[in-house]
C-alpha cells in the first residue's frame, strides 16, 4: 500500500498480505537530549509503515492502532520489526507488529489497516 522508500527503516522481507520484516538503527539524533531515550514516534512510524507495506492495495489507511512501548531504547540500538497479518475481514487487515532489540521486545502494536481499493469495490457491489 506504500512505496518502499516511505518505509521507516530498511525493508528486509515482504510477503504481501502475510508478513514483513524491517530494521532500523537508532542514531543520536533520534533520541531525547535529556534522557537519551529514543523518541517513541520512530518506533510507531517503523511499525505503522511496515504494517501498511504488507497490505496489497493501491491505497490503504490505518484505521486503528493499539501500541505498547515496553522497554526504553537508546542510541546505537538496532531494531528489528516483524509485521504479521493475523486475519482479514472484507476490506480490513488485522496486523500484529513486534519490534525487538537484542531479541527483547521493546514495542508492540496491533493495527487495523483498511484497503481503500477493496472498500470502494464493496461499495460498488452493494449499490448494484
Where in the sequence are the language-model features?
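Non-catalytic linker/capping segments at the edges of enzyme domains
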Residues: 1-30, 125-128
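Intrinsic-disorder/low-complexity, polar/charged segments enriched in Ser/Thr/Lys/Arg/Asp/Glu/Gln
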Residues: 6, 17-23, 64, 78-80, ...
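A structural signal for short, hydrophobic beta-strand segments that form beta-sheets
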Residues: 11-16, 62, 85-86
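HotDog/MaoC-like acyl-thioester-processing domains
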Residues: 1, 73-75, 86-128
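A conserved, well-ordered hydrophobic junction motif at loop->secondary-structure transitions
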Residues: 16-57, 61-62
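Surface-exposed loop/turn and secondary-structure junction residues enriched for glycine/proline
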Residues: 14-17, 34-35, 41, 64, ...
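Residue-level recognition of well-ordered beta-strand positions that form the cores
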Residues: 23-25, 68, 82-84, 98, ...
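Hydrophobic beta-strand-centered segment that forms part of the acyl-chain substrate-binding groove
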Residues: 48-80, 85
Amino acid at each position: 500500500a506504500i512505496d518502499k522508500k516511505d518505509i521507516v527503516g530498511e525493508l528486509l522481507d515482504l510477503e504481501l498480505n502475510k508478513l514483513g520484516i524491517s530494521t532500523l538503527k537508532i542514531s543520536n539524533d533520534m533520541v531525547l537530549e535529556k534522557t537519551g531515550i529514543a523518541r517513541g514516534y520512530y518506533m510507531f512510524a517503523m511499525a505503522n509503515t511496515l504494517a501498511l507495506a504488507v497490505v496489497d492495495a493501491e491505497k490503504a489507511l490505518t484505521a486503528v492502532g493499539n501500541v505498547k512501548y515496553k522497554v526504553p531504547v537508546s542510541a546505537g540500538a538496532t531494531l528489528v520489526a516483524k509485521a504479521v497479518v493475523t486475519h482479514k475481514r472484507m476490506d480490513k487487515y488485522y496486523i500484529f507488529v513486534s519490534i525487538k532489540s537484542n531479541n527483547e521486545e521493546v514495542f508492540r502494536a496491533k493495527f487495523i489497516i483498511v484497503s481503500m481499493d477493496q472498500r470502494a469495490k464493496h461499495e460498488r457491489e452493494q449499490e448494484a
